Amino acid sequence: MIEMENIVVEDEATPQRRRIWLLLPLAAFLVLVALFYFRLGAGDPSRVPSALLNKPVPEFALPSMLGGQSVGLDSGDLSIGVHVVNVWASWCGPCRLEHPILMKLADDRRFEVVGINYKDVPENAERFLGALGNPFAKIGADRDGKTGINWGVYGVPETFVVKDGVIVHKFIGPLSEEGLAKDLMPAIEKALGATTATAQST
């Protein structure tokens, strides 16, 4: 009788052990996903790392988006000083939401705000700026999106901080007051501080 009971218990335990072994790979996968998620900034898409950080800006030369301007934007324009480069489009809803932040940034004369107009219709882009204001010192029209690809743009809007031709910071998604205060502005201040320190040492 005792032997039969032992056999029954053993038979019941075997499928349970099998289920545990089957679930182990899934559990390991979920752990890896969680680690990857937190390494990317606790799920904050604005903190996804860029392969171009601390590297020179990709070479580019874009025509002007605005009909009255003959000069667009090229990599040489970013070679000296601190620049905030915003990639935007008139068809981008979040770009409209972040636009007041860019207008505020444009008031700070310690750096220059420039724009890359991404895969847009020039007339629509001009209407967009006509309605909301133009924070950009220069704008280049990236009509085919190739420059955006070279910059590693995931989608619009995206904002880069460039110091002396080197990308030092990247913010993905629409800027907000919180994003400006906690992320972008500290990166700008750091770049400005590094520029000042370099100038003083020479």
Task: State where each predicted segment sits.
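Hydrophobic beta-strand anchors of alpha/beta hydrolase catalytic cores
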Residues: V84-V85, V113, T159
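A short beta-strand-turn-helix
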Residues: F60-V84
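Structural microenvironment flanking redox-active thiols in thiol-disulfide oxidoreductases
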Residues: R96-G133, R143-I149, K182, S201-T202
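Thiol/disulfide oxidoreductase modules built on the thioredoxin-like
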Residues: G130-P135, A141-G193
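N-terminal targeting signals for export/organelle localization
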Residues: M1-P63, T202
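Hydrophobic alpha-helical transmembrane segments of integral membrane proteins
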Residues: R18-L23, F29, R96-L97, V153, ...
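Compositionally biased, proline/threonine/alanine/serine-rich low-complexity intrinsically disordered stretches
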Residues: L192-T202
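Aromatic-flanked redox-active Cys/Sec active sites in thiol-based oxidoreductases
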Residues: N86-W91, Y118
